[in-house]
Regions:
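Short glycine/serine/threonine-rich phosphate/pyrophosphate-binding segments
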Residues: 288-291, 315-317
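Generic hydrophobic alpha-helical scaffold/packing signal
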Residues: 259, 263-267, 283, 292, ...
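Short, contiguous acidic/charged loop-to-helix segments that flank catalytic cores in large enzymes
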Residues: 253-254, 313-314, 361-365
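A glycine-rich phosphate-binding loop feature that marks nucleotide/adenosyl-phosphate handling sites
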Residues: 276-288, 341-342
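A conserved beta-strand->alpha-helix junction
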Residues: 228-237, 303-308, 314-361
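Nucleotide-activated chemistry modules centered on ATP-dependent adenylation/adenylyltransferase
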Residues: 164-165, 171, 342-355, 364, ...
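Enzyme catalytic cores with a strong preference for nitrogen-chemistry domains
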Residues: 1-281, 292-303, 308, 333
Length: 375
């Protein structure tokens, strides 16, 4: 038996497109020999959907898409994250799709309400474990925050689970993956259950989800790792209830990890909002040079335009460096002098500045003048 992890870059609110991505992933998983595929948390609507979760029609659309998805993937078993509404209550849910229908549904038990999370605003707490039989292996379900505490995993174990499937939308920060490994190893130690951990990938507003999904066996050893910061599919074979060794990856350096997170965040922010590209200011300094490199790696040079806005305080070296940076990365480049704006500023404040010696006040006003044409 093979279990597949679908690490997919979803778009919040684009339910039809997300469902199509899941169908395509299920087809690939089937071709790879998998009979079960696990998605990430709230995969059908994308995470975090925020106040879309306050709309009744949103749940109705998700429910219809879930039924359509079940029919489209008949012959595979899928565990899909989605929002669910029942008797006026809302839940962060995961449903088992089997034989073209919804077979079982689990409701998330632990709702994070700190930092970037505010799930208590939207959802009710689930109370019961969910365990189902797949080809002789009893699989329990947890959703993200559930595994950061002990009770949900222990409840699944008590209900007969022999393996834990965990759907996640766990955002990136530096060294986050190591923290995840430590948390999951603690759940493994407490329950003796291997874990299949599927994480969302992609940028959504200020958040970046790094993916880096994995499988850990009952000893706490990694059996499979998926790449970070990109969509991916991974399959692990199970023999007599034990996951077999799959591909492991070399860890990213801290610098590479941060750079890839920034690049992915920029790319998805631009693309998911439908922007044609990026306009950015080049100063000739290292900060804007790095920003330019991230933009080009995210979108390609054809979607980036760089603007140098020199004033009388700008050194010739800065202008030369800015132009060289733009040429090296093959982006469109223009110079837009802001001295006329500075002169207008000086004229407006001439009476207030009368009798005062020119100092850093005037020079530092350059940043304000540069903002005007950018807007």
């Amino acid at each position: 038996m093979k279990i597949a992890i679908a690490q997919i870059n979803y778009t919040v609110g684009d339910i039809e497109a997300n469902a199509n991505l899941i169908v395509a992933a299920a087809q690939r998983a089937r071709e790879d020999g998998a009979s079960l595929m696990l998605t990430s948390e709230l995969a059908l609507c994308g995470y975090p959907p925020e106040d879309l979760l306050l709309r009744d029609d949103f749940y109705a659309t998700c429910q219809q898409a879930l039924l359509t998805l079940a029919a489209a993937t008949a012959g595979m078993t899928l565990v899909v994250g989605h929002p669910h509404q029942e008797q006026g209550k809302r839940y962060n849910a995961a449903s088992v799709l089997r034989d073209g229908a919804v077979f079982k549904t689990y409701w998330k038990q632990k709702l994070p309400n700190y930092s970037v999370f505010d799930e208590e605003r939207y959802f009710e707490f689930g109370q019961e474990p969910c365990v189902f039989n797949h080809e002789g292996l009893l699989l329990g379900i947890n959703i993200c925050e559930d595994v950061w505490e002990s009770l949900p995993a222990q409840s699944a174990k008590a209900a007969g689970a022999q393996c834990l499937l965990v759907l996640n939308a766990s955002p990136y920060h530096l060294n986050k993956q190591q923290t995840r490994y430590e948390v999951i190893r603690e759940r493994v130690r407490q329950t003796g259950l291997p874990v299949v951990y599927a994480n969302q990938v992609g940028g959504q507003d200020e958040l970046v989800f790094d993916g880096a999904s994995f499988v850990m066996d009952a000893r706490g050893a990694l059996m499979l790792e998926l790449p970070a910061f990109e969509s991916a599919m991974g399959c692990v074979e199970w023999i007599e209830g034990v996951p077999q060794q799959g591909a492991l990856l070399a860890p990213l350096s801290q610098e590479a990890s941060v750079y890839q997170a920034l690049t992915l965040g920029v790319r998805d922010y631009v693309n998911k909002n439908g922007f044609p590209g990026i306009l950015l200011g080049l100063s000739g300094g290292i900060d804007s040079a790095l920003t330019l490199a991230i933009a080009v790696d995210a979108l390609g040079p054809q979607r980036v335009k760089a603007v140098m806005m020199p004033s009388q305080y700008t050194a010739s070296m800065s202008r030369e460096d800015a132009k060289a940076e733009a040429e090296a990365l093959k982006v469109r480049y223009v110079e837009m002098a802001i001295k006329p704006l500075f002169d207008a500023f000086q004229s407006t404040l001439a009476q207030e500045f009368a009798g005062l010696k020119e100092d850093a006040t005037e020079e530092n006003s350059r940043a304000r003048h540069a903002c005007a044409p950018a807007l």
